[in-house]
Amino acid sequence: MEQNEIYFDRKIYNTMLKWKSERSGDTALLIQGARRIGKSTIAQEFARKEYKSYILIDFSKVSKEVSGLFNDISDLNYLFLRLQFIYQVQLYERESVIIFDEVQLQPYARQAIKHLVKDHRYDYIETGSLISVRSRSRDILVPSEETKVDMYPMDYEEFKWALGDTTTIPLLRTAFEKKMPLGDVVHRKLMRDFRLYMLVGGMPQAVYAYITTNNFMAVDQAKRDIIALYEEDFGKIDDSGRAKALYDAIPAQLSRNAMRYQVGKAIEEERVSRIMNVVKEMEDSMTVNVAYHSDDPNTGLALTKNEDYFKMYTSDTGLFVTLAFKDNKITENIIYDKLLNDKLSTNLGYVYENVIAQVLRATGKNLFYHTIPYAEGKKYYEIDFVIPDRHKISPIEVKSSGYKAHKSLDQFCAKYSDRIMNRYLIYTKDYKRENGIEYVPVYMTMFL
């Protein structure tokens, strides 16, 4: 399991319940996402609660004997008898589930899903990281009998659940729906709470470290371990080290405030055209979130996507913070305390942009941004994110402070006025609506 010590409630559980009741064994469930986000844990917890029995086959540490069973599945009766004997678990028809954990490590097990699902005796749940699932599935017949579900780091609501707080998010939801400010005292506490989420992040290991130690250095070490694991995985994407270089440069790239990721700054003499396949693989791995420039933003943002212009974010903002201080042997508690108390240095203001990207992706939105050149052409106005909103679009400008200037938003709205549903400025002050603009505190982004 990815997180042995503790189980955290996750929203994906309800998605899994829906799959079980609606598909009734007609498909396997494939939970895909980055490493260390809790895929194995949720699969096992679901199996334990929702089935009479289950077998967990962890292909990262399975014996050659078990792995070899899937090289020849011509006799399913024999396969099931062997699995029951090896794991000492009795399987019950339509009441048991078999979990293929880290299924990418045994491609023939994934290929077998077609026949196992057709057999219909048991349910099947697969977990895998996209880095490996893509790279290791090229020589097999990928089954169509899969229901794929993306899993992300713990979102803010899941983080609050882990801390034993089930009341904050309903309050925020009601306030947002009623367009109500919460008042200075409440707002200050909510901002401090959200900054804590930004610092710890949503990786279960980091959250567990925070809960059990209340020590940011322990949290930071947990995050450094995850980053090291990701960087090792990036070698599977590109053994020249370019993926690792692109990832490590994310904080520096965002701090430059350039209109796109400057590949040549991260990798000397490299060009976007030569690196896009690596960027795509990184995006597919779900270790990063990538926002693409929309050249003519309108309904159907993907139709105007310019892949030569992109920005890259870490999939988890807690990892972003650790990545920003990676040169330090360990990020000291005092640094975290300063960040928690809103003493961000200027170049770390982009942690807010990263967390907005993370929140938008977790709510199922693809990431797009837009730039408009100044009249003199040397500078540009930038809308950080553009999201679909019913039959129109809504621009989002992000401020890492309470600063309410919104020239970019004004320029965008003037140019595309007939396409716009709502105008959002996300910042660090209380909610307000003024002159057609919604000023949304960062902790309410999930409701957009």
What is the role of each PLM region?
Residues K39:
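Conserved lysine of the Walker
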Residues R48-E65:
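Conserved catalytic segments around the Walker B and adjacent sensor/switch elements
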Residues E2-I6, K11, K20-T27, R36, ...:
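A cross-kingdom feature that marks ATP-driven nucleic-acid transaction machinery
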Residues I99, D123-S129, D150:
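Structural recognition of the conserved hydrophobic beta-strand(s) that form the central parallel beta-sheet
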Residues K61-R94:
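Short glycine-rich substrate-engagement loop in P-loop NTPases that contacts/grips substrate
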Residues H115, S132-K148, K160-D165:
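Short regulatory helix/loop adjacent to the ATP-binding pocket of P-loop NTPases
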Residues I31:
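Hydrophobic anchor at the beta1->P-loop junction of P-loop NTPases
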Residues G164-Y352:
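Interdomain hinge/linker elements that couple catalytic modules in large macromolecular machines
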